[in-house]
């Protein structure tokens, strides 16, 4: 089952968690005090570059409908949409640049280039997801209401199509994001406030309608006036650009919470949760992937998902330097710092989806010690005296060491079993 006591699972005392919070608060203060012109210049240049890229893509599509120009224009437009959504829109709406007091680059005014309303995203993502990260029954991002991503979710027949559902979700990800705040499930079950639901539906329809008109009516009609393009060529290019953005966004976001090591939590964790426990839950419930400058930029710096969840309102261009200090904090408290290559992390999310399409009786691991979900019960065999300092080395024995010890014992049991089975056959 999911983690019910984050302190026990992390092998930390109350004093440890207070000290952890103080260290992470210090990192925040240092970044806030050093924010300035360099950061403002970064976001303004990023916005200018993104807009130039979008114009270039649309000019390419207007100039010619030949295959090379069409693909170049569609890819350019797709990349522009990725940058606008990932590095600009998502981060601006988190308030990362509100300190600049620029009315254009502000969380309260930015409307991003996708079918979902910024107002709805700020609630479902900034408030619900970031406050209740990976808490079952509270964070709707745990499976998005259609995917089984942990053994803690009861298997249902439609889960057999887990991989199919995520393929569909990836292709139309912007629509999944747009529909999330409508809470369609509650509406059908009669549990939604009718007036609030009507308001959300009107807001969704207005934004989605404008987006569909822009991408699939206005721009195709405009470019059809050019002798080198047709309405259909631009329409299909816009569809491809949106799918490119959708699939990439889905991949990056899924790498942040569904690879092995991204923990899940029960509702009881939120009762009187102090700041240190909130920090700890963000660290344990998130996962990074390794990235160079280009991949960092194209992921909206969400390759640093752990740091983003610790400091969602700090500028994205500072997360890389923050990650060095966060990793050091993890090492001091013997906490795992979950990361890996992009392809490995993304592959693990698909592996989890494939495995969990089956009922638990066909799975080897249990919900207390599985790749995608663990609980404090997995450490029952270590005994109460395990946490603390190693009597030989004097080093702290925390969560990372405890996980390694459990895995070591499990490997030893399997090896012993494989040795005894041939002996039994020989006898």
UniProtKB/Swiss-Prot annotation:
- What are the protein's UniProt keywords? Cell membrane, Fatty acid biosynthesis, Fatty acid metabolism, Iron, Lipid biosynthesis, Lipid metabolism, Membrane, Metal-binding, NADP, Oxidoreductase
An individual GO BP term: long-chain fatty acid biosynthetic process
One GO cellular component term: plasma membrane
> Which sites bind Fe cation 1?
90, 94, 125, 130, 308
**One Pfam annotation, family name?**
FA_desaturase
- Describe the processing and modification events after translation: Is rapidly degraded by a mycobacterial protein degradation system that specifically targets the residues LAA at the C-terminus, leading to a post-translational proteolytic regulation of DesA3 essential activity.
* Membrane topology annotation: Multi-pass membrane protein
The cofactor named in the record is: Fe(2+)
Quote the cofactor binding remark: Expected to bind 2 Fe(2+) ions per subunit.
Q: Which GO terms describe its molecular function?
A: acyl-CoA 6-desaturase activity; metal ion binding; oxidoreductase activity, acting on paired donors, with oxidation of a pair of donors resulting in the reduction of molecular oxygen to two molecules of water
The annotated modulation of its activity is: Inhibited by the anti-tuberculosis drug isoxyl (ISO).
Question: What residues bind Fe cation 2, as annotated?
Answer: 129, 304, 309
| Pathway annotation from the record | Lipid metabolism; fatty acid metabolism
Q: What triggers or suppresses the expression of this protein?
A: Is expressed during the exponential growth.
E.C. number? 1.14.19.n4
Chemical reaction(s) catalysed:
octadecanoyl-CoA + NADPH + O2 + H(+) = (9Z)-octadecenoyl-CoA + NADP(+) + 2 H2O
Q: Which InterPro entries match?
A: FA_desaturase_dom, Fatty_acid_desaturase
Could you say which enzyme class this protein belongs to?
oxidoreductase
Alphabetized CDD domains for the sequence: Delta6-FADS-like (cd03506)
Gene knockout outcome: Strains lacking this gene are shown to be attenuated in a mouse tuberculosis model.
Task: Describe its assembly.
Answer: Interacts with the electron transfer protein Rv3230c to form a functional acyl-CoA desaturase complex.
Anything else the record notes? Answer: Was identified as a high-confidence drug target.
To which protein family does this belong?
Belongs to the fatty acid desaturase type 1 family.
Function field: Is likely involved in the aerobic desaturation system responsible for the synthesis of oleic acid from stearoyl-CoA; oleic acid is a precursor of mycobacterial membrane phospholipids and triglycerides. Catalyzes the conversion of stearoyl-CoA to oleoyl-CoA by introduction of a cis double bond between carbons 9 and 10 of the acyl chain. Requires the electron transfer partner Rv3230c to pass two electrons from NADPH to its active site diiron center. Is also able to catalyze the 9-desaturation of palmitoyl-CoA to palmitoleoyl-CoA.
Q: Which protein are we looking at? A: NADPH-dependent stearoyl-CoA 9-desaturase
Organism this protein belongs to: Mycobacterium tuberculosis (strain ATCC 25618 / H37Rv)
């Amino acid at each position: 089952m999911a983690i019910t006591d984050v302190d026990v699972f992390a092998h930390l005392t109350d004093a440890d968690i207070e000290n952890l919070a103080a260290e992470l608060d210090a990192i925040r203060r240092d970044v806030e005090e050093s924010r300035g012109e360099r950061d403002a210049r970064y976001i303004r240049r990023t916005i200018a570059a993104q807009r130039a890229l979008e114009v270039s893509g649309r000019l390419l599509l207007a100039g010619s409908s030949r295959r090379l120009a069409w693909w170049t224009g569609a890819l350019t437009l797709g990349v522009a949409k990725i940058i606008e959504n990932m590095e600009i829109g998502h981060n601006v709406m988190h308030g990362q640049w509100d300190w600049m007091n620029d009315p254009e680059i502000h969380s309260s005014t930015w409307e991003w280039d996708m079918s979902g309303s910024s107002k709805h995203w700020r609630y479902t993502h900034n408030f619900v997801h970031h406050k209740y990260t990976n808490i079952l029954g509270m964070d709707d991002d745990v499976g998005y209401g259609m995917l089984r991503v942990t053994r803690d979710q009861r298997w249902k027949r439609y889960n057999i199509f887990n991989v199919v559902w995520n393929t569909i979700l990836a292709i139309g990800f912007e629509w999944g994001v747009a529909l999330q705040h409508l809470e369609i499930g509650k509406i059908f079950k009669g549990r939604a406030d009718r007036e609030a639901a009507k308001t959300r539906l009107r807001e969704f329809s207005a934004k989605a309608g404008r987006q569909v008109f822009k991408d699939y009516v206005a721009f195709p009609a405009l470019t059809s006036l050019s002798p080198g393009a047709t309405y259909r060529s631009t329409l299909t290019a816009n569809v491809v650009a949106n799918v490119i953005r959708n699939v990439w966004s889905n991949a990056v976001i899924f790498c942040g919470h569904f690879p092995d090591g991204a923990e899940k939590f029960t509702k009881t964790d939120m009762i009187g949760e102090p700041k240190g426990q909130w920090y700890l839950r963000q660290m344990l419930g998130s996962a990074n992937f390794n990235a160079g400058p280009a991949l960092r930029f194209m992921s909206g710096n969400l390759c640093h998902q752990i740091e983003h969840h610790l400091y969602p309102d700090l500028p994205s261009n500072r997360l890389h330097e923050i990650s060095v200090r966060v990793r050091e904090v993890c090492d001091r408290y013997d906490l795992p710092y979950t990361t890996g290559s992009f392809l490995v992390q993304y592959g693990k999310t698909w592996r989890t989806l494939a495995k969990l399409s089956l009922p638990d009786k066909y799975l080897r691991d249990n919900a207390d010690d599985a790749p995608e979900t663990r609980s404090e019960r997995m450490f029952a065999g270590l005994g109460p005296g395990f946490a603390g300092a190693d009597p030989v080395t004097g080093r702290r024995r925390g969560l990372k060491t405890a996980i390694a010890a459990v895995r070591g014992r499990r490997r030893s049991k399997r090896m012993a079993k494989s040795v005894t089975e041939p002996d039994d056959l020989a006898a």
